[in-house]
Regions:
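Short secondary-structure transition hinges
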Residues: 99-138, 177-185
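Short amphipathic alpha-helical interaction/hinge segments
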Residues: 72-75, 105-109, 123, 160, ...
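Hydrophobic alpha-helical connector segments
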Residues: 77-103, 107, 144-153
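Helix-turn-helix
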Residues: 16, 20, 24-58, 62
Length: 201
């Protein structure tokens, strides 16, 4: 077990549990994580964790929602920046998005589950309307006038997210350890902007 959350950080009890959950969920994945693991990581009592969050599912939901909001908090200024070109936006978003997903491998499945169970809440959470009206979407429309910009945006997003969704299947089909998988994604940081340029020609 990694070092416990230090008391001197000055975090509240709730924040200690959330930080511990981020560490353990990332390390072990949702299915293999037990609430006891999180309590031990936080250096706090299991009963206290149950008092604050009631269940592993609830804690996971809170932590992942914060991660989604952090992601789109980063993306929004990039998508809406009129001072950068379309290709500069693509070059900025691609590596940052992939790096974030590498640090939070359970996030794509959480997002899919959240979209299925509560699409309206998820749309509000990521401010979907702001994305559709962003400078990025306008630039896509201007660059490729004969294609709906939503099609291009879905391609862009899918090329980054899909490898994380199919990882378990991929590793059963292709002999691939974790290092090889990460290397595959490092290559996609370069390839995805190239593929987007080809689509936009």
């Amino acid at each position: 077990m990694a070092n416990k959350i230090k008391a001197e950080k000055g975090l509240s009890t709730e924040e200690k549990f959330k930080e511990a959950a981020r560490i353990v969920f990332t390390k072990k994945g949702y299915a293999a994580t037990k609430t006891r693991d999180i309590a031990e990581q936080a250096g706090l009592n299991l009963a206290l964790l149950n008092y604050y969050f009631r269940s592993k599912e609830r804690l996971f939901e809170i932590v992942m929602i914060e991660k989604v909001q952090q992601l789109f908090a980063f993306m929004a200024p990039v998508l809406n920046n009129p001072g950068t070109s379309l290709y500069e936006k693509i070059d900025l978003i691609t590596p940052s998005y992939i790096d974030m997903l590498l640090k939070n491998p359970d996030l794509p499945m959480f997002v899919l589950s959240e979209i299925k169970s509560n699409p309206e809440r998820f749309g509000k959470m990521i401010q979907a309307n702001n994305i559709l009206q962003s400078s990025f979407m306008r630039q896509l429309a201007e660059e490729k006038k004969d294609v709906n910009p939503i099609q291009l945006f879905l391609n862009f997003l899918g090329m980054m997210v899909f490898p994380f969704i199919v990882k378990p299947v991929l590793q059963t089909i292709v002999p691939m350890n974790e290092d090889a998988y990460v290397q595959l994604l490092e290559e996609r940081k370069v390839l995805i902007p190239q593929w987007m340029r080809m689509m936009l020609e």
